[in-house]
Amino acid sequence: MQIRHFNRLKRSVLLFASVLLLSACQIESQPKSEFEKIQERGVLRVGTLNNQLSYYIGPDGPAGLDYELARKFAEELGVKLEIKPAFRQADLFPALKKGDIDIIATGLNQTSQAVKRFRPGPAYYYVSQQVVYKKGQLRPRDIEQLIEYQASKDSQSEEDVNAGAQTLKIVEQSQYVPTLTALKKQYPELQFEIVGDADTRDLLKHVSTGELRFTVTDSVELSLAQRLYPDLALAFELTEDQPVSWFTRRSEDESLYAMLIEFFGNIKQSGELASLEEKYIGHIEAFDYVDTRAFIRALDDKLPRWAPLFQKYSEEFDWRLIAALAYQESHWKPKAKSPTGVRGMMMLTLPTAKSVGVTDRLNPEQSVRGGVEYLRRIVARVPDTINEHEKIWFALASYNIGYGHMMDARRLTKAQGGDPNAWADVKDRLPLLRQKRYYSQTRYGYARGDEARNYVENIRRYYQSIIGHVSQKPSIDEDTDDLQVIPPLNPELLISGAVETIAEEVSGASDITNEVDEDLDQEEE
């Protein structure tokens, strides 16, 4: 009796053990999530476009809006970042589908075609699709006028019946293909050519040189391109504003997508996203055709002569930023003079020149060295509560109107409920320093704050134009395959843990008060 009981107990134990073993095997055989694979690999593989907005190699290493966001996302995941830049957008989605990259981070429109095949992340800015033409030529103001122009080209060309199609080209697998394809169903006469051996920047250049009549790009890309090709102009808009986002693979596994949602939610709430967008695209709205044409000529005629001088003395600064500052000051004229007494390449006042050891303001080498030293001293005074990448804009405003007036603008910003550590907020208050109702309550009084704002924004535009001009030849060799890993110039930039300081949140007041002054007093000292 005891033996039978023991045997039953033995069988029960063996059965229970078998169930446990089977369960363990099933648990081990469950596929790992996307997020777990990335953690195990220790690397987030990001595909992006090599251009002046998403990703480029600067003097201090990788830069660009999408690069900085991707670096921060990798930090959040606790892994290293591996950037795989492409020259052609057409290479990105196939690489994502094959699993060669984990994310596309280059600001693509959420078109219906892309959304069906891949999962878009949160929108982080908006653009419209625009038809672009060359200033001075026939401007179609809608799709019907464009079709009329193409029809006239067909009738004029006896040798090529497709002459109309060759007037409008777009990039293969771009967000513009489904837009024009849908329009062609509505307007069968519409003609366009899809090219696979060029990117949008190439086509924009061809429009500027007259090799191509029209192309399609987005509103941000056009604004950036106009700094290099001022003849480019908007013909008409094809779409309303559309969301721009990153993309991941579409599957039942939402682990990486969930992390992406949380990441963008956090940086939006903290203001970090707005700060980065201000850094890269906050300056592109205004466009002066005449000034830009003169600047582009100077890039070819004058910059090659003075670039070595800017590179020699820039030290911790990007030499292209120093070049932009010098152009704003003197248009790269070493003998420049002003009725107000400022002189030279960097337009130094006599007291400023003496303070930085400049004995001859009209000597370009002394002027550049002195101007950089003066800027360095101002940057050192800018409060550490301001994000590192925004300090330079506050310093440039101080270079123009004086440090005290810049601090007044910060106090005014805080009093009105803005963030005194965010350039986007402070630059909007600078013009108020002209108005008596505001400057009468400030410490340093009246100032031409609107000129200081324009001064800084001009320098930012010149800076981006120089970046684009210098990098028209790709940062990597043309023979290099797309999506090849580019080793960073500074490996520390790709290691998680180097989290940047986020500007502290500030609660504003409705009036300028002594309390506001006291909060910023220590920073000014």
UniProtKB/Swiss-Prot annotation:
- Region (Disordered) residue spans: 506-525
Q: List the active-site residues.
A: E329
Which EC number(s) are documented for this chain?
A: 4.2.2.n1
Instruction: Indicate where this protein resides in the cell.
Output: Cell outer membrane
InterPro entries noted in UniProt = Lysozyme-like_dom_sf (IPR023346), MltF (IPR023703), Solute-binding_3/MltF_N (IPR001638), Transglyc_AS (IPR000189), Transglycosylase_SLT_dom_1 (IPR008258)
What job does the chain carry out?
Answer: Murein-degrading enzyme that degrades murein glycan strands and insoluble, high-molecular weight murein sacculi, with the concomitant formation of a 1,6-anhydromuramoyl product. Lytic transglycosylases (LTs) play an integral role in the metabolism of the peptidoglycan (PG) sacculus. Their lytic action creates space within the PG sacculus to allow for its expansion as well as for the insertion of various structures such as secretion systems and flagella.
Question: What name does UniProt use for this protein?
Answer: Membrane-bound lytic murein transglycosylase F
Q: Supply the source organism for this entry.
A: Vibrio parahaemolyticus serotype O3:K6 (strain RIMD 2210633)
Q: Which gene encodes it?
A: mltF
